[in-house]
Amino acid sequence: MQEVIKAVNERGIPLRVGVNGGSLERPLLDKYGWPSPEALSESALNAVHALEDEGFTNMKVSLKASDVHHAIDAYYLFSTQSNYPLHIGITEAGTAMTGAVKSAIGLGWLLSHGIGDTLRVSLAADPVEEVKVGFEILKSLELRHRGINVIACPTCGRVEIDVVRMANELEKKLGHIKTPLNVSVLGCVVNGIGEGKEADIGIAGGEGKGILFKKGKLMRKVPMDELMDTLIQEVELLAEEKEAEAAGAPHNGSSSEQAEAGWELMGHTPDEQSTIVRDIPVLPSKS
């Protein structure tokens, strides 16, 4: 241990104390009977105290378990007993889909309660996907603001456009944009415009044509075969505007032609609009 401490001190780098439910010390397994959250927390505290006894404090701690509830409990318990930074993650989470879900639930709960300083999403997939999922978790909790956030409605009998294809295409074609923007792809105008109020820009399907809107305000009708290209162009222009505003520089403005505001554009009245109230549920920790 002294050699490790000497090496990291010479290089001025922190040390990560990593505790894993799959490799817990035998005495703690005998004491608790299984790799419980209490056992994980005690193991981490023992390691921290051993390093402190050597005069070393430049560290962060991780307590990983593949069970979401056990990981949450372990991190929460340790956070009540120590102030060291926490590297959070659900280890061996699973494949791209199941691992992303487990990580989103576990890391989302911890982060929403102020627990966690760095994170790792563990997937049996391309490591690039791990980074993408991690950023999406942070973006969903509004802890990081970078890139396009595509908001798309589920398919139903009212959809007038191929929402699934267009949403996926948007994520790929707008992946180069770093400016944080909410972009909506909504299948119809019945609920679409109301739901799109929280988006910076978006489109909704109509009868033989689509509509372009910004912040829930109708901008203009667009032929179906031009809808995707128009949205991509407008998103890129909006990103440029926001970047210029952030830099304090003038910009040329959007090429959108301001259409007459109101639902009359698509033959609907304002009272058909709807709004969404989004609540972030809190996952109770299982004891």
Model-derived features: where do they sit?
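Short, charged, surface-exposed secondary-structure boundary motifs
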Residues: M1, A96-G99, F213-K215
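Active-site-proximal beta-alpha core segment in soluble small-molecule metabolic enzymes
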Residues: M1-L24, L29-Y32
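Anion (oxyanion) recognition and catalysis
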Residues: N9, T80, K197
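Conserved, mostly hydrophobic/aromatic
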Residues: V17, V61, L110, C153, ...
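Catalytic alpha/beta core domains of metabolic enzymes, predominantly
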Residues: N20-S23, L28-K178, N182
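Conserved structured catalytic cores and adjacent interaction surfaces
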Residues: P127, C156-E160, L170, V189-A199, ...
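Iron-sulfur (Fe-S) cluster-binding modules
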Residues: I177-V185, I201-S287
